[in-house]
Structure formats: structure tokens, C-alpha cells
Amino acid sequence: MASMISDAIIGKNLGWKFEYLTGGYANYPIDEIKEIAKNISMVYGEKIWINLGILEEKDMDKLKPYVKGICASIETVEEKLHNSLCPDKSIKPYSEMLKLAKKKGFKTSITIVIGIGEKKEDINLLFDFIKEHKIDKITFYALKPVKGTEFENVNSPNCEYYSWWIKKTREKFPNLGIIAGLTPKKVDYVKSILEAGADTLTKFPSIRLFNSEKAKSIEKQAESANRKLEGSLTKLPNIDWDKEVEKLDIDDETKKTVKEKLNQALIRMSSKKLS
């Protein structure tokens, strides 16, 4: 918990948006997830997004005081491709969850991976899905080949193809929130995906690569695309970080641990990066 609070404090004060609570937390008891959401929400001063698999209505109700949006990792809306890649999680339960979330007043979002075998004509299926479910936000990810998977020897989509999906989606939905995933190996994509219509970048390890050459490249490319980043990837604010911890309504022992984690992270972020 302390590490998550520490990261949230850094993110808030550097102007980084919190995309969503996800990952292994899906296996946590709902009350523990609620506590995590409560603390991150407290740091940011607003409700957060979550991406935790299929949520039941009773769990949505428990999380609602701290959660404003629910994301579904659809990956692809082309059903045959989806069923071949994700045989254990069909689209239907996610579809039902998104519709229920909307009825209960949540914002909704989906994630889509580009480069997994989809075709350009599948974009019309994506548009239909967005309209049917009244999606507020979409996150695109470019396939990252992972050793030991069926995509181990598949190349990531090139910049032009990845940007095409973003551009066409932006043209169809001018008011849709569009987030584009970015890996350290693909920082040269930034200018193109911002010009294509992405609002936000995600997946870049901002703390680990803070003030690195790659972080500097992202800022330069954003400027070249005539886009101003809301936060900084290269400059730490001159603030009293301990005061940021003291503001929080958490117990003294947790505060002490958060301060330790925060100090460790800030030392790493202040060191010179060569990559």
C-alpha cells in the first residue's frame, strides 16, 4: 500500500494522470481493493478508474464512493479473433458489465491491442462497439512481443499502422478520450500518435526513466506535434514532499513508510539517466 501511495503522490505532483487501477489487484478481496482505491483517490483529490476484470454489481456499489470509471480489457472486438486469443474470456460478459456500469452512473472505457491479427476493416466493428456501449474513453496498445507466447516472433505494429487506428477513431469520435500505450522501445512514435489524435500517453515507466534521454525525447516530440504535456517527465517540483504525505488521512505508521518509499523514489529520479 505504501508504495502505491508514494507513486500516486509523485504522479499527482508531476501532473501525471492516473489511468486506472489494474493488474494483480483483480485477485484481491473487494474490501482491500476498496481501500486501495480510497487511498489513491484521496491523493489525487478525485475518483479514479479501475480495470479489474468482470465486476459484479455489488462490487461496483462498494467501489462507487472512490471510482468514477470502469474499464474492460476487450483487446479486440472482432469476435472470432477474440475467441481464438482469449478463449477463457468472451466479449459478452464485458459487454454486459459495461452496460451495467453505465446504468449505475459510471464512465466506461475499453482497451484495444493493435497488431494481434486484426484487419483495417475491423475498425467498423470497433466503432459500433463504442456507439452501442456509449464508451467515454479508449486505450490503444501496440502489441509487445512476449517470449513464451504465440506472439513471441510477431513484430510490433509499425508507427504508421498504429497511428492509423488512432486517427480514424479520432475522426469518428471527436469527443472520445483516446489514450495511446507507449513502450520505452517505441518513444519515436510519440509525435505521430499525438498528431493522429491521442489525448494521453500511457505505459511509459515515468518514474524509472524520469529525466532519461527517452523522457526528454517524449517532451520534444510533443512540442514538435504542437502539443503541451500537462505534466513533466524531466523536472521535479520544488515542494515539501513530507507535507504531501502529512495531508493524507492515513495512520502514522503508514505515513512513515510512505515517506521512506517516497524518498527512495525521489533519489532515483534525481540521479542522472543515460538511457
Per-region residue spans from a language model:
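Core AdoMet radical
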Residues: 1-5, 11-32, 36, 40-96, ...
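Active-site-proximal loop/turn and secondary-structure-junction residues that shape catalytic pockets
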Residues: 25-27, 52-58, 76-78, 114-118, ...
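Alpha-helix-loop-beta-strand connector modules within alpha/beta enzyme cores
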Residues: 29-52, 73, 89-107, 153-178, ...
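Catalytic cores of alpha/beta
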Residues: 56-66, 116-131, 184-196
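Auxiliary Fe-S-binding modules of radical SAM enzymes
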Residues: 133-275
